[in-house]
């Protein structure tokens, strides 16, 4: 499809700018003026609308296709929460920072505070900040809070953060951004961080352990409380990556198990759409002893019930301009309020039921490296198909031809030819049966006609793309 | 409300396939002592009841206040097509485009976005967006540390103070240092900035227009920084780029800023997007996602996420940054906004902002005792000196439904009388005249 720039016709007008109702100012000084105009496309409104409408049709999305993308939790986005999120479009975030401005924005401030309280109860934490703008931003914020805690105690020798090898790549990257060195612990045959190796790695130079539970294999680690206790004994803190929280709402609270810090991905667990790669939102919750180190400012409830924005002088400072991705937070607040206690528990129960159903039906044809009851996602390996020369990616591309977004492939890194499937709670048995049939069909074709899978996809506007060429050419904008 | 579709009969069938007697049995791997101690949330409700609560909260959101405030976030027009097109579910309910063949919509849109950002900033390579303006400045600072292998940045204090706080925080853990240089009045102190560059300086970071609204020429600063092996980072406000010389034209190495004003509503703080663009030679040091052009197995043009070897899912703790997603949907809004206005409209919009602000400047300085503090050119913001403390004046005008500006004292100690006023194309002559009248009244009493 042509680029919007290629549809441009010199002199064609787009949207009209308002007429000026003030006198013309003396010209902007030439010395500071740009020499070249900005070469934006010149298209009519209809050209524009057709272009982006037709572009959108080249996307798979949750609203158009089953999207079982493991660990990314692509669940259905409730529509009323979209409406709710849009209600705040006209609220300026600088208002509460003006003298006397807080009383004008009690509605959005109460929402920030309300969401913080909801998330604290859901995760078992004492306080939450909504400032971080994405999950990985939350991770970094959480680790910065941990660093501030150790520093305030005069504990200067802690320079390591421990992560399991199955962790999301963002965990070690975030800890490195906060200045830590990373120690990676391998996965034991029971599917989680090797307890013995973890014990050996733990000492008084470790600042924190970062984990997710259930982990990226979809397994609940039975040693989780012990791991927290060992870390605490050595003076380290425990960080919970909330990416997989959708599996345990109302069942387990990381704060009860022994975690000190958590981030939650609102776009994963609380049904805010991810927009093709963002926005997300990554609030961070902490236990009592860490509250002083949360970022500034904080929304506090005063004695008279009103909400105020307060500086947080001992905190790590600002990690974003204002109160986080507010309109995303508003969607999550609306979702939690809409579903309520029983609705959220039902979410986890059905997410786990659906994942186990798919696992049970596919394990005859696909290798299941950790054959245990799974939580919200299950991880297969295409190792059997590989014997016929078929890779996980070939199966993924075949699914596209059959109308399904592929599961996550090649992650986690500790499973060869990994295929990670997360159906989520909102998919029906009928949809999953269709998906399972296609997965079984792919396994059969892998045996009978592997070439057919190498050719896939054939129904999409483009076929398999040359990624090496893209990296070499580095063509990242239109000349 | 049930979004979970399976009926009791279907649940029984599924459990039979799994070999479990109940859903609860599936949670057996969780030891009893680890079960939630509390889950104290109210019961759910209907859509109707929910929207009543949400409307109440939104109604107490200050949207009726006439804003002459910016602080990095601006109240601009948003063409209707931006909302309609970005509301297409194929865009907003999709994920990061890991499977390019079924994500060409998002990928091509991001490639077009990158092209728009390069054209706005006068740069050669853009990523697919960052979180927001403040974190974008911080990422640019980190990028300069990686490129130069030095550990100190010089930060012009006329940069948005919220952004400065973020930069300082980001550098703190890495034992890198941010040295702040105080402004000269309402402008950057170019001489002191140049003098502050030493052998360990990775970059000088300035903002144009700056937090006071002043527009400056940083060409000489670029030359001096480069002479000492340092980079120049210019943070900017994209609407101004319809009129003001681009970072590229001034010789900057990295251009960053907040893209909010390109088609994203105020929304009490987000979501917005940060933009970052640079010279092609620094592309491997760009943080975040990048979309690249390539061809498919039949020679057709297509787009993919590229240079992924820099990213955390491959490099883990050695990645260029921890940023895993971008602000795709907000960037899409920015793209559609720019394409809606087009070459001519975008320039007209910038000129309109300039003209309206110049009008406001002349009206407000007509008030007795009020003068402009900026020495030279301003864009759509300017800083006034009032004959008394600015904070109580702003408070008084808020009660009349007008946010007159940002009092600077909380960010620049000693500037008690200073007030930064923002005027966008949305402020009418009548609103500006009313601001002048209210200000006069407040100062007289």
Curated annotation (Swiss-Prot), chain B:
EC number: 1.4.4.2
Enzyme class label: oxidoreductase
Superkingdom of this protein's organism: Bacteria
Reactions catalysed according to its record: N(6)-[(R)-lipoyl]-L-lysyl-[glycine-cleavage complex H protein] + glycine + H(+) = N(6)-[(R)-S(8)-aminomethyldihydrolipoyl]-L-lysyl-[glycine-cleavage complex H protein] + CO2
Annotated keywords: Oxidoreductase
InterPro entries from the UniProt entry: GcvPA, GDC-P_N, GDC_P, PyrdxlP-dep_Trfase, PyrdxlP-dep_Trfase_major, PyrdxlP-dep_Trfase_small
GO MF assignments: glycine dehydrogenase (decarboxylating) activity
CDD domains associated with the record: GDC-P
GO biological process entries: glycine decarboxylation via glycine cleavage system; nucleoside metabolic process
Pfam family, one: GDC-P
Family: Belongs to the GcvP family. N-terminal subunit subfamily.
Family matches, as HAMAP family: GcvPA
Function description: The glycine cleavage system catalyzes the degradation of glycine. The P protein binds the alpha-amino group of glycine through its pyridoxal phosphate cofactor; CO(2) is released and the remaining methylamine moiety is then transferred to the lipoamide cofactor of the H protein.
Subunit structure: The glycine cleavage system is composed of four proteins: P, T, L and H. In this organism, the P 'protein' is a heterodimer of two subunits.
NCBIfam families (alphabetical): PRK00451.1
Record protein name field: Probable glycine dehydrogenase (decarboxylating) subunit 1
Taxonomic source organism: Citrifermentans bemidjiense (strain ATCC BAA-1014 / DSM 16622 / JCM 12645 / Bem)
